């Protein structure tokens, strides 16, 4: 019986019933022997056929994502005297090219690393110098926008002093690899920034959608205020980028310890990038100290000491590391402690007023 059916299927034999059924889309499921003993022509055999319903859509099997890797490159950047904007652009493209070569999804530059451009501009008092620097904003934006597209990478372009309505703001720009640009204003201004540059604060906490998840950017001093990270996490952020600029180790440790605390409090990752080296003849930028890094919550599924990767202190270098965005999602609801889930909203809350 099996041989007979196979020959009908291969068109070697013609069967009035079976050939017609197969030609109309019926599918042979199996042969049933001794199905009808009185059918002498078929020796009691029968075929079980299925005619598929073309309008039927089977229920899809749910597939759960178990891992979502994101590769981050953090630049620990050395401040240096420059002779032109082109020299600055060459140095920036070098780092972007390195990150792209290692297939990074994001590259993070430090806070106000564009202040090194003042080394070739006229030596003026700080209030005038920062406005001269702000005049280079279109060139800065054009440079990093082109680099993000050319090298297919999302760039957090450190931060840059920008003039809006004749006020100076410290702004971190996100350059997506699709060519779009977003910005986050520094919300808390340090005493030094007010004294030397007259910087004004922003008042919006942004969470940006990217092709690798939702991110938040907090510029240096901002990471020392836990309310910002709480609000950003409530808005969906899973990764916080912190460009910073500190002149000595005490200031650096404030940024670093607060970034690590924010990771534990909110179940997020944090990447921090700072400047190193000396910059003569630029007011308030004489010395720099940094040990840039990528930090995690503190639990079994994450890195030892909650440090995913870390630079050697105070030298120009990069670190490149993969983080798993699915881990932080699961950690918030199944970690050893549930800092996010166990908040006492009946006792306290963090409210964004604007």
Where are these regions (language model features)?
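Terminal substrate-recognition subdomain of acyl/acetyltransferases
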Residues: 1-70
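Short hydrophobic/aromatic beta-strand or adjacent loop that forms the aromatic wall/cage
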Residues: 43-48, 169, 203-205, 287-290, ...
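Generic N-terminal amphipathic, Lys/Arg-enriched alpha-helix
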Residues: 66-81
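Cys-nucleophile CN-hydrolase/nitrilase-fold catalytic domain and related Cys-dependent amidase chemistry
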Residues: 85-177, 182, 246-261, 265
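CN hydrolase (nitrilase-like) catalytic-core segments centered on the catalytic cysteine
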Residues: 134-156, 223-316
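Active-site catalytic loop in hydrolytic enzyme cores
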Residues: 146, 162-239, 248-261, 334-337, ...
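Short beta-strand scaffold segments in enzyme catalytic cores
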Residues: 157-158, 171-174, 206, 272, ...
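A short C-terminal boundary segment appended to hydrolase-like catalytic domains
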Residues: 323-354
């Amino acid at each position: 019986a099996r041989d007979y059916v196979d020959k009908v299927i291969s068109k070697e034999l013609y069967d009035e019933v079976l050939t017609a059924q197969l030609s109309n889309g019926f599918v042979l499921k199996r042969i049933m022997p001794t199905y009808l003993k009185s059918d002498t022509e078929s020796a009691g055999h029968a075929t079980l056929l299925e005619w598929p319903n073309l309008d039927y859509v089977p229920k899809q099997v749910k597939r759960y994502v178990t891992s979502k890797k994101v590769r981050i490159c953090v630049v620990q950047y050395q401040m240096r005297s420059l002779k032109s904007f082109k020299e600055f652009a060459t140095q920036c493209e070098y780092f972007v090219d390195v990150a792209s070569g290692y297939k990074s999804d994001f590259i993070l530059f430090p806070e106000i690393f564009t202040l090194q451009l003042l080394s070739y501009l006229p030596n003026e008092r700080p209030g005038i110098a920062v406005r001269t620097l702000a005049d280079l904003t279109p060139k800065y934006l054009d440079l990093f926008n082109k680099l993000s597209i050319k090298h297919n990478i999302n760039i957090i372009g450190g931060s840059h002093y920008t003039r809006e309505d004749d006020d100076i703001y410290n702004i971190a720009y996100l350059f997506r690899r699709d060519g779009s640009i977003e910005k986050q204003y520094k919300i808390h201004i340090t005493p030094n920034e007010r004294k030397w540059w007259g910087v004004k604060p922003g008042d919006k906490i942004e969470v940006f959608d990217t092709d690798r998840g939702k991110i938040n950017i907090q510029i240096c001093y901002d990471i020392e205020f836990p309310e910002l990270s709480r609000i950003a996490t409530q808005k969906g952020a899973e990764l916080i980028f912190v460009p910073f600029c500190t002149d000595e180790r005490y200031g650096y440790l404030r940024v670093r310890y607060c970034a690590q605390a924010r990771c534990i409090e909110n179940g997020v990752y944090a990447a921090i990038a700072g400047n190193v080296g000396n910059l003569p003849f630029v007011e308030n930028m004489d010395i720099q100290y940094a040990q840039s890094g990528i930090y995690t919550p503190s639990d079994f599924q994450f890195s030892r000491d909650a440090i995913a990767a870390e630079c050697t202190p105070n030298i120009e270098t990069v670190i490149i590391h993969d983080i798993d965005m699915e881990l932080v999602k699961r950690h918030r609801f199944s970690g050893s402690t549930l800092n996010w889930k166990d908040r006492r909203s009946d006792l306290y809350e963090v409210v964004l007023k604007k």
